[in-house]
Amino acid sequence: MARIAGINIPDHKHTVIALTSIFGIGKTRSQAICAATEIAENVKISELSEEQIDKLRDEVAKFVVEGDLRREVTLSIKRLMDLGTYRGLRHRRGLPVRGQRTKTNARTRKGPRKPIKK
């Protein structure tokens, strides 16, 4: 297994799909990485040479991924909550943040129904 950005990349998958296992790299960005490193998208990771894997590592290192990205997102949400913004309050209460309706639906965000006590 190749190790890129601290993640074990699955050998049996094509390069584009395997790179998406890194947090912060989606399909579009993985296609751009393959184009920049001149590696075919349909080649499996196990078929790549060590030099090609090093090229992939160098290209992925240019982006904010994995732990740094997770920390950035967490700090951004914490900042909103500390400022007391509307979005921060919605995060704190565990409700939808982007204007979705909550009279019905939003069960994923709100959690299971709580029975009304009589």
UniProtKB/Swiss-Prot annotation:
Q: Does the keyword Repeat apply?
A: no
Keywords, in A-Z order = Ribonucleoprotein, Ribosomal protein, RNA-binding, rRNA-binding, tRNA-binding
Which sequence ranges form a coiled-coil region, renumbered to this chain? none
Q: Which domain of life is it from?
A: Bacteria
Residue numbers spanned by region Disordered:
91-118
> Which function does this protein serve?
Located at the top of the head of the 30S subunit, it contacts several helices of the 16S rRNA. In the 70S ribosome it contacts the 23S rRNA (bridge B1a) and protein L5 of the 50S subunit (bridge B1b), connecting the 2 subunits; these bridges are implicated in subunit movement. Contacts the tRNAs in the A and P-sites.
- Subunit and partners: Part of the 30S ribosomal subunit. Forms a loose heterodimer with protein S19. Forms two bridges to the 50S subunit in the 70S ribosome.
This protein's name = Small ribosomal subunit protein uS13
The source organism is Pectobacterium atrosepticum (strain SCRI 1043 / ATCC BAA-672) (Erwinia carotovora subsp. atroseptica)
Source organism phylogeny: Bacteria, Pseudomonadati, Pseudomonadota, Gammaproteobacteria, Enterobacterales
Gene symbol of the encoding locus = rpsM
